[in-house]
Amino acid sequence: KTTFTVGKSFNIALIVIAVTLYSVTTYAADNKATRHVSALLDLIDNSLNYSKEAPNDSIIQWGNELAPLLKKQKEYKTLFQLKQLIVTAYASRGDMNMAIDHARRMYKEAKELNSPIGIALSSRAIGDAYLNANMQEPAIESYKEALELLDKIPGSEILEQEILPKFILTLIQTSHMDEVRIYLQKFENLYADNP
C-alpha cells in the first residue's frame, strides 16, 4: 500500500509539473506572439519599414505567421499593410525577385478577395518593389493605379500621402514634369486637409 501511495503521489507530482511547464510555455509563447504582433502593428501605425525590435527577417517570418489570422478575421487593410511590410523587408535585404514575386501574389490575393484597399496596397507594394529594383516606369504605373484606387476609398488620405513623395520623386527622375505638377498639387491638397 505504501508503494501505491508513493507511486500515486509521484504521478500527481509529475502531472502538476507537466501542467505548470505547459502553462509557463503557453504563457511565454502567447507573450512572445503578442510582442511580435505589437512590433508589427507599431511599424504599420508609424509608417516604418523596420525597427530594432523587428528586423527584416523577423518581419517576414512574423508577418507570414500573422497573415492567415488577419485573412480569417477579414482584417484586409491590416493584412495588406502587413504584406506591404513583408515586400519592403525582402527589398531591404536585397532580395528583389522575392519582393516583386510577393507583391504580385499579394495583388492576386487582393483581386480574389475583391478588396479595393488590398488591391490599392498591393499596387503600392508592386510599385515599391519595382522602384527598389530600379524599374521606374513600371513603378510609376503601379503607383498611379494605387492612387486612383485610393482616391475612391474614403479615409485613405494618409495612405495616399505615404505614396506621393516617392512617386513624385520618381516622376522627376524620369522627366514626367507635367505629371509632377499635377501630383504635387494633389499632395499639397491632401496635406492641407490632413496635416
Residue ranges and their predicted role:
Residues 26-195:
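A "functional boundary" signal
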Residues 2-13:
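Bacterial N-terminal signal peptides that target proteins for export
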Residues 11-22:
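Bacterial N-terminal signal peptides
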